[in-house]
């Protein structure tokens, strides 16, 4: 934390509207909302900023079938709406806005919202989630919204009886491929390695599906089309003596190659792993900064489930309450 950085914050402090809160939650997936429910019930008057995607990744999921208590399953958006209402019922102040800068050098912790408002928080719960990764091809930007997607359940409907490609070799890629195969005429699964990393059950589903063709040891290196995606440039066994380049006609190109945690603004202060997941004390949501907790996918490289995110949101709120109590702040 250079003095230049703190000078910027001093200047921002003078210019910005500042609000003091006991408990600030950034992010509104299952982790953020569950933290808000528990913090609200503990009379911490929590303030939650919803972030770029209110409701989080689950709002892009049609059916959640593995969340306990819903034997028939529930839609992702419906589940998040229920959590939101529950948080509101217990007094959480839920707002739209994105955390754009952070200064966790000392308490109260300063979080800038939308580059225009400063929140000074005695405790901070980081529940900012993770965002889908892209390959980094220029064409991904060019065809964004015109055939390129990172969410099969959001956009699969547009590809009924069409041909699509899914990139990736893990569970997500296999799940997306199977989901799309229920809509599309044909699905290519483009896998860089000579094998799938997915769970056995997902591998079997993919390999047995008559609409899915798996292209092992293939790289997607570009897309083409006049008014949207019409095909993909592929390289088989890239860099090998028998490397082969060819094109396949497709209408849609779906990315399923993992996620990047939304932790960048906190990195100067909390520890992160090589991918960017926030490192917490084992078995707790505690970061190395006292009073700052991380919950949900932003701190979870292993499970990334709605129920585990909710569980860590609960833990973070309980930790925040204990921290404030020990400091005599409640």
Describe each region flagged by the PLM:
Residues 21-90, 174-200, 273:
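Beta1-alpha1 glycine-rich phosphate/pyrophosphate-binding loop at the start
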Residues 29-30, 53, 130-132, 171-172, ...:
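Residue-level detector of alpha-helix initiation sites
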Residues 94-157:
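Glycine/small-residue-rich loop that forms an oxyanion/phosphate-binding "nest" at active or ligand-binding sites
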Residues 1-12:
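Single conserved hydrophobic/aromatic residue that forms the stacking wall/gate
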Residues 131, 136, 141-158, 257-303, ...:
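FAD-site-proximal beta/loop scaffold in flavoenzymes
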Residues 176, 298-330:
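A conserved FAD-binding loop/helix module that cradles the flavin
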Residues 84-113, 118-121, 182-282, 322-330:
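A Rossmann-like FAD-binding core segment of flavoenzymes
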